[in-house]
Amino acid sequence: MTYIISDIHGNYDKFHKLLYKIKFSDADTLYINGDIIDRGPNPIKLLLEVMQSKNMIFILGNHEEMMLESAIDASCYATWYCNGSTPTEKEFYSLSFDKQFTILDFLKKCPIAIPNIVISGKQFYLAHAMHLPYYINETIYRNDVSKKLLWETLWSRQYKRPDYKQLVITYHDLYSIYHNTTFICGHNTTPSCSYGITDSHGGGRISKNMSGHLINTDCGCYKTGVLGCLRLDDMQEFYVQ
């Protein structure tokens, strides 16, 4: 089975609770669509486990990009700090220099967009916040795009705004060659989105637009306490709190 999750934000215990719930095994594949680190208690512990896994595929999020930028340019640190870097820094700087280098090197090599995943006859395009504004049919990495496009792919809030319908139309036209491509993102918590849904207690739920080809999996784990996971084989949803 193939699963996707996003925006775990250092919640190591909740992540393992979810793996237990879906009965995740060596025969399965898990895509993590950005934002493993920051805010929660064990971001580096979680990241190291994902790095060592053979069947977990990590797609870069804006929080990992902030970490990379801060390592290169100290002037970028304030932005990272204001977005919850403290737990990540605490764990990261307790590691050896070699281990720190290994982590940064891993993140530099992570994809930012995977447009061609086919599961049970359905095609999926994965990116943390936004698809690229032009057609792609292969995995894209940080160094493949300009800084502006990198920012848009990892940081865009356009799918949160009321005018997201126009973007959905643009996306649908761009990928009409596939007829049935579904874009899956995170980044914007579903309770904050114009198309988002919640449970009876205000907890986030995996949300989609009316046509179903835009899906957001960021249930706001660090805010609402809900971590959601989508199984792509049959589109079944799983949640832990």
Q: What positions do the PLM features span?
A:
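N-terminal active-site segment of His-dependent metallophosphoesterases
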Residues: M1-E49, S53
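Active-site-proximal beta-strand elements of phosphoester/diester hydrolases
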Residues: M1-H9, Q123-M130, I215-T217
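Residue-level marker for buried hydrophobic side chains located in beta-strands
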Residues: I4, L30-I32, F58-I59, Y125, ...
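Divalent metal-coordination and catalytic microenvironments
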Residues: D7, D35, V50, G61-N62, ...
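Catalytic metal-binding/acid-base residues of hydrolase active sites
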Residues: H9, I37, H63-E64, M130-L132, ...
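Active-site neighborhood of divalent metal-dependent phosphoester bond hydrolases
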Residues: P43-N116, S120-F124, I140, L149, ...
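His/acidic metal-ligating clusters that form di-metal
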Residues: K99-L132, I136-Y195
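Conserved beta-sheet core of the metallophosphoesterase superfamily
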Residues: L167-V240
